[in-house]
Amino acid sequence: MIPNDQFLLYCFDGTRQPVDRLARHLAARAATLPELRTRVAEVPGGLDYPYWVRGDAVDVRTHDGGDWVAGGGVRGVREAVAALFADQLDPRVAAWRLHLFGPVVGAPRCTAEGIVVVLQISHALADGRRASDIARRLLTRQPPDIDTVLPGRWGPVPAAAAAALGWVGFPTALARTVVRGAGAVPARSELDRRTEDGDVPPPADPCPPTSLNTRPGPARDIRLLVRGRADLAAGGSTVTVGGLTAISLALERLLTVRGEDVPGALTAEVTVARPRRGDEHNAFGNVSVPLHPGTPVSLRRSLIGRSLRAARDRAADPAWARIRAADASVPAVLARIGIRGFDIDTPPPVVGAPPWCRRWRAATAIWCWAAGGWRSPPASPRCRRPWG
């Protein structure tokens, strides 16, 4: 299972309630949120995509000073949260977990002892926007909306039926994938032509990998930099642009200190939200944004903002819907094979502008496999609606 947990950290100043009491309160609230009453159920044999089914696990954990550092310092909380990255969720058991640390001394911008709350949530359950909304409803003071419990319990008959449906539907899904994949070829040609004509922004230039483009080891480290929105969105830019500017400066300095060349095409892969389709849990895509190293900070911020807008405009072009149409129909068996065959240890020769087979993923899987060169990155977590 590919690690994909998100960690949303919140700090509350001057909380007077004991941590254990707060944990019981939040556990009761979590039981009222439908999204937190679900888990993933695998289809036997992997013959179809997993289903969302009802799950009653409520996992709220408290961490006192003995778990991290004597005195409850914020440094100990950072170290404890970093250690959580190694303890990934199994969404087949529970797709979320809540951690409470407190009382915490010395938290940024806190005037008294505080409580740190960390929502650990599987990306299969929610993207960043959806996860933030869940956290907001979990931690708000207002009474939560009592919604209907999501249907379905996983039993032997539904499991067998789901496997049978996946097996019977395989030929149709495969044929649909081939047809849609073939339709992606003219759509791609059209996009390239419109790019050459200047109607669509061009993609970012490819960037040679640096020492940062390697698989990280098991150790994690966390630093907290608390900044106001106005600090990052200075000069009429956005928080995203301000953050990318800071990252650009940091990467440039780090590579220089390491004695490495700073690529002129230094690029960041940025997650960009898109309109949500139906009841999907993840509605985002990644775009490559040049970081413009070597330019003055004020100009760099402007250039990054312009590059981000161009990348968003390119990603929103209608041609991509036809290019990626086969993703929605690729059989689960083939998707699993592609994910298992993805090499996460060997970096590609260039980053920021993936080659044709990697960019089209499932839409061209058949032809890429035939050429023996498919190295598709794992797709976003995908599950079907509740079964039962």
Regions found by a protein language model. Name each.
Residues 2-4, 14:
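N-terminal ordered "arm"
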Residues 384-388:
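Extended, hydrophobic beta-loop-alpha segments that form or line the acyl/peptidyl-thioester binding
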Residues 9-19, 27-31, 38-383:
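Soluble acyl-CoA-dependent acyltransferase catalytic core bearing the H(X)4D motif
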Residues 1-2, 347:
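Short secondary-structure boundary/capping segments within folded domains
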Residues 22:
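His/Cys-centered metal/cofactor-coordination and adjacent catalytic loops
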